[in-house]
Amino acid sequence: MLIGAHADDDALSHGTLAMLQAHGNQVYVVTLTTGNVGTQDPKLSRTQLAEIRRQEELAALKELGIPGEHYINLGYDDGLLEFEDRKAVVENLVRWIRKLRPDVLFAWDPGKNFQRWHKSDHRAAAYLAADAARAAMWRLLFEGQITQEGLREFMIPEYMFYNDYDHQDENVWVDISDFVEKRVNADAHYISQYGPGWKNYNPNPSEAEIKVMKDGALDAIRTRDGKRIEGFRYYRGLPDAIGK
């Protein structure tokens, strides 16, 4: 299960998610916002952009082999996540954690021994995911989900935290060499977010524009010991100690 703020936040883990799905795991992606603000194209409304972002994410996940019904969008406004009712958002996430009961949670890294810097929605998503993971294990937190909805408390045993600014706390590097093509093809579906679509959205970019996007996606994949990798801060244990 991955929890992110926006429809492309999972891109930092696309190779790993594709590998997990290919090996028989059931991967779910939970996006907190609709992505309905992040454009410089004056022709797009919030409603239009939200639908574009949804379709782009579904297309990207399809490239990774992840079914469309495994994509869950919680519908919050882009850019304002930290101003939402925090308790309500955590309760919403707890519900999905208790429903899906994931073996591993992928999320923005909230930080180790300090609060890691992320831009606003990413910062909020990091801590909302961590707080929801902790709350989900306690039966008397959001107990209506248990007494009225038939869910059960659940503790996520393992965590894979990602970060896009620096990698100093990484301790696990996943070899995605066999899934590079899937990651590149998936990333190329984010037309409204990368390349010329950022300022002038065109749902049918030229072959040259697609090539530029794919080249950029390939260049963004890191190399370690001659292998294409994605890096994470791996943690196993009680949610209380996620940041230690």
Each model region followed by its residue ranges:
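Metal-dependent de-N-acetylase/amidase catalytic core
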Residues: M1, H23, K87-K244
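Active-site rim/loop-helix segments in enzyme catalytic domains that contact anionic ligands
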Residues: M1-L100, A241
